[in-house]
Amino acid sequence: MISQAAPISARKIPSPAATKEEMVLTTDQLVKIYGGRAVVDGIDMHVRAGEIVGLLGPNGAGKTTSFYMIVGLVRPNSGHVIFCDTDVTDFPMYKRARLGMGYLPQEESIFRKMTVEQNILAILETLPLSKTERRNRCDQLLHQFGIERIAKNTALTLSGGEKRRLTIARSLVTQPKLLMLDEPFSGVDPIAVYDVQQIIVNLRKSGLAI
C-alpha cells in the first residue's frame, strides 16, 4: 500500500515461463516520509523476467516517489530494494544502472541538436566497445525500432512517437535486465501510442522485465 489515504496498486502482465529464479526486482516494505507524513507506506513489489508491471493510482498516491526509490533518485526511510539478488537500497543510480537497471524518464532526455544515430552512438561511446561494435549495435537498434529512415534527422525535428522510439532505443544500449518507464505514452499522439505499446510487448517477449 502507498499512502494510507490513497493507495495505489500494481497491475501485472505475467511471463508464462517465469520462475522464482528469474526474479529481477523485489521491493520490501518501502517507506518514504515527507514532512512527518508517510507518502509511501510499505510497498511490496515483485517483477520477474518477461513481466510488465504498472503502478496504478490517483494523483498524489505515491507512484512517482515509489518509482524514484526503485531507480535510486530518492532514498527510502525504511525498506529494501533488491535487484537481481543484490540489495541496492543504498546504491546510487549509476551503480544500479551498471547492474542492469534501465530508466526512461518522462522528461525528454535526447540531445535535440544531434541526429538520431548520433544520439544512440553518444551512449554507446560510454561502453568498452570498438568503433565497429558501436556501429553495428547502433544499426541494430535503428532497425529494431524502425527508425533507420530518420537516422540522419536531427532529434528536434522528430514527432512525439519518433522521439519515444529513440529514447527507448537509447535506454537499451546497455542491454538492461529491467527497464523502468515513467509515463511512456506522455507526449505521444494517439496513433503512435499503439506502436509504442507493441514495442513494449516485444521487449517483454525478449525476456526484459518492465
Residue ranges and their predicted role:
Residues 179-182:
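Catalytic Walker B motif of ABC-type/P-loop ATPase nucleotide-binding domains
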Residues 154-158, 162:
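Conserved ABC ATPase signature
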Residues 132-150, 198-201:
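Conserved ABC ATPase "signature" region
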Residues 79-86, 99, 137:
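Conserved ABC transporter NBD signature motif
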Residues 56-58:
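The feature captures the beta-strand-to-loop junction immediately N-terminal to the Walker
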Residues 175:
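Conserved catalytic motifs of ABC-family nucleotide-binding domains
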Residues 194-206:
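Helical segment within the ABC ATPase nucleotide-binding domain
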